[in-house]
């Protein structure tokens, strides 16, 4: 139900983007609002539709089935992973509602996420939302990797694994490699905004 709701919300945001881009004039009449819609649409579709439904729900059922395993390696970890997502979505929606919201460039171009561009807590709320979603993804990735490595039936060698299982396995490994980098970057962004550090300050030289 949570994933379906997130999917409907993401689809409605996607339709807003397509409508804005599909006609010559401006529909929303606000570039910042459009940027916020693009950002929220991406986060909602990835973290709250694809992750819990396609990977969390469908993958948790199909991967053990393909491995001949009775269940995932850590069944309760799925619950922990899922229940981090509703507060994450709440924080993301709160970030879009506070002041002018968090626009598209704030994760890519640090000056756009400075206190001058976003004086209020919208970027901070988006960062905390990403932290929760990232922890949820890491828990799920650990569960999948452990399941694929340790829960195969005795005759199932790695080279005989179905391609779907391999795709989940490789994706989980890449996720574990990339997410800590993102977490470190947005944490440095958080300290720049709130503790006067100069990680992303061109004049400060970095801490």
From Swiss-Prot:
One annotated GO molecular function: cytochrome-c oxidase activity
Subcellular location: Mitochondrion inner membrane
Protein known as: Cytochrome c oxidase subunit 1
Biological process, per Gene Ontology: electron transport coupled proton transport; mitochondrial electron transport, cytochrome c to oxygen
Cofactors demanded by this protein: heme; Cu cation
GO cellular component: a single term: mitochondrial inner membrane
Keyword Repeat: no
Gene that encodes it: COI
Chain's role: Component of the cytochrome c oxidase, the last enzyme in the mitochondrial electron transport chain which drives oxidative phosphorylation. The respiratory chain contains 3 multisubunit complexes succinate dehydrogenase (complex II, CII), ubiquinol-cytochrome c oxidoreductase (cytochrome b-c1 complex, complex III, CIII) and cytochrome c oxidase (complex IV, CIV), that cooperate to transfer electrons derived from NADH and succinate to molecular oxygen, creating an electrochemical gradient over the inner membrane that drives transmembrane transport and the ATP synthase.
Pfam families: COX1 (PF00115)
